[in-house]
Amino acid sequence: MGIKVYKPTTNGRRNMTSLDFAEITTSTPEKSLLVSLKNKAGRNNNGRITVRHQGGGHKRHYRLIDFKRNKDGVEAVVKTIEYDPNRTANIALVHYTDGVKAYIIAPKGLEVGQRIVSGPDADIKIGNALPLANIPVGTVVHNIELKPGKGGELVRAAGASAQVLGQEGKYVLVRLQSGEVRMILGTCRATVGTVGNEQQSLVNIGKAGRSRWKGIRPTVRGSVMNPNDHPHGGGEGKAPVGRKAPSTPWGKPALGLKTRNKKAKSNKLIVRRRNEK
């Protein structure tokens, strides 16, 4: 998918870019796979903001995606490649030979008319899903499960990929996009290939309004607030932070503090951290 560059007809259009959507084959989604999506605007059930900078945006329908890929041995044909407003990756509508329709994450190189299949005996082809233990070393994969049968949780964003490095007993070593090397059960499934729409990260939003269309509200710096609103606020002119280290709006340390639980059970499955050389 290419990048479309706009002429600077207005200040908002200057330097603005967008995807050309050349891979998209239809703009009409499969109605049976849509569910309504309520805009929470970052509020919880008490009406209080629990996630800042969310609200507004264009109304969306949620597309039901098959992350489990557990219809073993049943072939499916790719019918369309579609845009999904709820994720950075594109999605593909597939029709199984038994009549079932499903959406999957569209990997790079997947084309309309291509046949895909899931199961331990599936070929190592783009779009096929099989257990990690059955995938050869060096293969690039995405949509990786962390628990067998739960559905893919890792490597689902546009352009993301992971690589199978080897096998140790019942575990398979996988190098993630961040550089982290992790042990995952060999019975967990993954899909062969890289997630498509890899140029999505190169798009220049161009103007504030495009972020608002996505439901993203402005982020105000703490240093321009009053001291009763933020620890960085107050002072005369452009005042420094005034504390030992930067803080969140609630006084907790920010920028660099590790937030992962040191006693997490999955720590033993991480062979190499993402920031280790």
Curated annotation (Swiss-Prot):
InterPro entries: NA-bd_OB-fold, Rib_uL2_dom2, Ribosomal_uL2, Ribosomal_uL2_bac/org-type, Ribosomal_uL2_C, Ribosomal_uL2_CS, Ribosomal_uL2_dom3, Ribosomal_uL2_RNA-bd_dom
GO biological process, one term: cytoplasmic translation
Presence of keyword Ribosomal protein: yes
GO cellular component: large ribosomal subunit
Pfam annotation, one family: Ribosomal_L2
Biased composition (Basic residues): 259-277
Stretches the record annotates as Disordered: 219-277
Keywords per UniProt: Ribonucleoprotein, Ribosomal protein, RNA-binding, rRNA-binding
GO molecular function annotation: rRNA binding; structural constituent of ribosome; transferase activity
SMART domains tied to this protein: Ribosomal_L2 (SM01383), Ribosomal_L2_C (SM01382)
SUPFAM superfamilies: Nucleic acid-binding proteins, Translation proteins SH3-like domain
UniProt xrefs under PROSITE patterns: RIBOSOMAL_L2 (PS00467)
Protein family: Belongs to the universal ribosomal protein uL2 family.
Function per UniProt: One of the primary rRNA binding proteins. Required for association of the 30S and 50S subunits to form the 70S ribosome, for tRNA binding and peptide bond formation. It has been suggested to have peptidyltransferase activity; this is somewhat controversial. Makes several contacts with the 16S rRNA in the 70S ribosome.
Subunit-level organization: Part of the 50S ribosomal subunit. Forms a bridge to the 30S subunit in the 70S ribosome.
Protein name: Large ribosomal subunit protein uL2
Primary gene name: rplB
